[in-house]
């Protein structure tokens, strides 16, 4: 009788567990922006010391930035879609750690992070276990998995 109860308890534990995945594949994770290339001029800037990080999980993308590698408690939040090698960011918010998040309606807030529209579309040029390269009409953004 005891064996039956153990088997029943084990069976209930197994069927009660759910394996949930986001379906984002290699895009999921934490990425450090390492370089920004300006397409019009061919210029390039090393951004590793800027401490700009993109975190991707579920259907949210968070951009965190630091000063001297110290997180300030603020960042940006976006909804995103990944369709046919196109990454679309939309619904931007300023994320405050201890306050209510605020919707963004001024694109100037986003430009330092390589985003030039409130609904921005990036072509995914490279995406593997270690690197990601995104391009829009203005910039090419290089990331390394962090």
What residues fall within each predicted segment?
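Sec-dependent signal peptide recognition
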Residues: 2-7
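C-terminal motif of bacterial Sec signal peptides marking the signal peptidase cleavage site
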Residues: 13-16
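Bacterial lipoprotein signal-peptidase II cleavage site
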Residues: 18-24
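Tryptophan-anchored aromatic micro-motifs
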Residues: 26-42
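General beta-strand recognition
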Residues: 32, 61-62, 86-88, 133, ...
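Contiguous, well-ordered beta-strand patches that form the walls/edges
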Residues: 37-48, 57-127
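Edge beta-strand at a domain terminus
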Residues: 77-83, 127-146
């Amino acid at each position: 009788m005891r064996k039956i109860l153990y088997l029943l308890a084990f069976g209930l534990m197994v069927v009660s567990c759910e394996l949930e995945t986001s379906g984002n594949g290699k895009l999921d994770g934490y990425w450090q922006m390492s370089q920004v290339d300006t397409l019009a001029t061919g210029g390039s800037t090393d951004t590793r010391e800027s401490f700009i990080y993109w975190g991707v999980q579920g259907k949210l993308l968070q951009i965190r930035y630091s000063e001297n590698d110290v997180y300030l408690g603020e960042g940006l939040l976006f909804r995103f879609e990944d369709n046919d090698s196109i990454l679309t960011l939309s619904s931007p918010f300023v994320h405050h750690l201890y306050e209510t998040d605020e919707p963004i309606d001024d694109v100037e807030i986003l430009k330092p992070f390589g985003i030039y529209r409130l609904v921005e579309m990036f072509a995914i040029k490279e995406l593997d276990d270690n690197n990601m390269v995104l391009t829009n009409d203005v910039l090419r953004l290089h990331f390394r998995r962090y």
